[in-house]
Design a protein with these regions (language model features):
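A short, solvent-exposed beta-edge/loop patch
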Residues: 64-68
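Terminal, low-structured helical/coil segments at or just beyond the last alpha-helical repeat
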Residues: 75-100
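Short helix-capping/linker turns of helical repeat alpha-solenoids
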Residues: 1-6, 10-14, 19, 32-36, ...
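Hydrophobic face of amphipathic alpha-helices that form TPR/SEL1-like repeat modules
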Residues: 3-12, 26, 41-48, 77-83
Length: 100
């Protein structure tokens, strides 16, 4: 099974008991290995505060990394622009540092 789909099952509790810890662990590996789909999911989780504390700079980081892997992804570009508009100046500075 696709590791991102497997992780999402645990994060949402779809067909299995919700287990954020397991879902995040399943998602982190592919994200760290450069899987853009996993990176987008990580960004979405941090942006929404689902299974993680809401952290816009970290969400921005994951979306920015995903966009580097898939530069034509307009949805990710839109997510980045939306996050940028929601962040304070200190959060933006942190987001830039985290994304380098």
């Amino acid at each position: 099974m696709d590791p991102v789909a497997e992780a999402k099952k645990y994060i949402t509790g779809n067909g299995v008991r919700q287990d954020c810890t397991r879902g995040l662990r399943l998602l982190k590996g592919p994200s760290d290995e450069g899987n853009p789909k996993a990176m987008i999911e990580m960004g979405a989780l941090y942006s929404a505060g689902l299974c993680t504390p809401r952290d816009l700079p970290t969400a921005y980081r994951w979306f920015a990394l995903a966009l580097r892997k898939d530069p034509n992804n307009q949805s990710v570009q839109a997510d980045l622009e939306k996050l940028w508009g929601e962040m304070t100046q200190p959060e933006r500075q942190l987001a830039i540092r985290l994304s380098q």
